[in-house]
UniProtKB/Swiss-Prot annotation:
NADP(+) binds at residues 169-171, 196, 237. Keywords: Amino-acid biosynthesis, Histidine biosynthesis, Hydrolase, Methionine biosynthesis, Multifunctional enzyme, NADP, One-carbon metabolism, Oxidoreductase, Purine biosynthesis. Its EC number is 1.5.1.5, 3.5.4.9. It catalyses: (6R)-5,10-methylene-5,6,7,8-tetrahydrofolate + NADP(+) = (6R)-5,10-methenyltetrahydrofolate + NADPH; (6R)-5,10-methenyltetrahydrofolate + H2O = (6R)-10-formyltetrahydrofolate + H(+). This is Bifunctional protein FolD. Homodimer. Pfam families: THF_DHG_CYH, THF_DHG_CYH_C.
Amino acid sequence: MSATVLDGKAAAAAVKADLKERVAALRERGVVPGLGTVLVGDDPGSASYVRGKHRDCAEVGIASIQVELPATATQGEIESEIAQLNANPDCTGFIVQLPLPAGIDANRILEQVDPDKDADGLHPTNLGRLVLRVREEITSPLPCTPRGVIDLLLRHDVPLDGAEVVVVGRGVTVGRPIGLLLTRRHPNATVTLCHTGTRDLESHLRRADVIVAAAGVAGLVTKENVKPGAAVLDVGVSRVLDPATGKSKLAGDVALDVAEVAGFVAPNPGGVGPMTRALLLTNVVESAERAAGLR
């Protein structure tokens, strides 16, 4: 068996094409969606990530609002910038790029973001709405990576209603919120959340119809632990030593040989990552649509 690749790049391109049309419709009404980013310090990885966000914005017609602060910025200075973005009608969604410098209370910073402008979909208020609304339509920003995982599966007709889904990793960006989305009346999946305290992880994996690997442990999921035909999505990222070069390189949680037994595989890179970026833009556009009374 050779697994079907869940192509996140192609799916993200389709999402962006749809967003481009929706942004054009908003512009005809005099509404221009805007993404704000708050970057503190000069970390090259963070700066590159933020630049990528704004390139994505340019593709679909979203305005860019960039706030850059030195690594010496105080808690109060960062909070002041957040307050300005909250009040700025040109900004329909924004993110605070993590990590923040040592000494900054990141949780306090993130909690001050207006929930309606929470482009990451991870504000406590928005996660609370996911807990409370099992059947009702969600009218607030959704967590980007979990939403991207589900979108990618549905686009490839992977059945989720009643499916056994095993999520490995309990981080706030993927592991914890994805269960809230998957156990809603739709998609209606059954979710097991595994982590470092899980006994006999392999037995959980072997029963799964869908595996979402988000632990940050290189090669954690191998073909011996995957049920034939299962869908396996690699969302984990860690650094390992490349024996060929002696340098570190990025690695996912899923071993390459999983493709020999799985029915579907979302590789890393190229799988869920592009969808995460595209759905961040979706949150920004949907916020603008709600503000314009279109949702």
